[in-house]
Design a protein with these regions (language model features):
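Conserved Class I S-adenosyl-L-methionine-dependent methyltransferase catalytic core
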Residues: 8-21, 25-29, 33-34, 39, ...
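Conserved class I S-adenosyl-L-methionine
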Residues: 165-175
Length: 181
């Protein structure tokens, strides 16, 4: 990765959180899946997502600024990447991984980073993985979202590694076996 030289590059890092949250919010309300049906208006997206129209406008403006959706003469449309990776049920969909694991499990932990670096957090505050797996609901959420996030990299690996002669496979990950499937 290139070394940063401009103030704007530092700002991009600082404000990336807002873009991520807009992405997670759009996934949460099914905006990309709604747009997979075809171009839409803010009014039709409001009906599709259950959000007030002015909030749809704000969300779509943020997503358009990042290139995740686009405004065309036909209306609001998904970008090719959103169609491929963020539409529920799409072949390469990993929206649940982003929405659930990154958005709901990992992002809240980022609020602890100052205390973690300073060493001022208690053991209970830093025991997230142990807590997740002791709670059946959180463990299921973690496993399902991790599976969704592993399917894409597994497909990428398969494109790069010829396994046509393989007779056995040892999965040492201990998860849902997304790479094996």
């Amino acid at each position: 990765m290139a070394v940063l030289t401009e103030a704007e590059e530092i700002s991009d890092i600082a404000f990336a959180y807002m873009g991520s949250k807009a992405l997670f919010a759009a996934l949460e309300v099914g905006l990309f899946t709604g747009l997979a049906k075809g171009p839409a208006t803010e009014a039709s997206l409001a009906k599709e997502t259950g959000l007030p129209e002015e909030r749809v406008r704000t969300l779509v403006t943020a997503l358009t600024g990042m290139g995740v959706v686009q405004r065309t003469e036909n209306g609001i449309e998904n970008s090719p990447a959103a169609d491929a990776f963020l539409v529920k049920g799409a072949k390469y969909d990993f929206g649940d991984y982003l929405r659930l694991q990154v958005g709901k499990q990992m992002y809240p932990l980022m609020d602890q980073i100052d205390g973690a670096l300073a060493g001022t957090l208690s053991t209970e505050e830093t025991a997230s993985y142990a807590q997740w797996f002791s709670d059946p609901t959180e463990a299921r959420l973690y496993s399902e979202s991790q599976h969704a996030g592993s399917v894409g990299p597994a497909r990428s690996l398969l494109k790069r590694v010829d396994l046509s002669e393989a007779k056995t496979l040892l999965d040492v990950g201990g998860g849902t076996a997304a790479f094996d499937i």
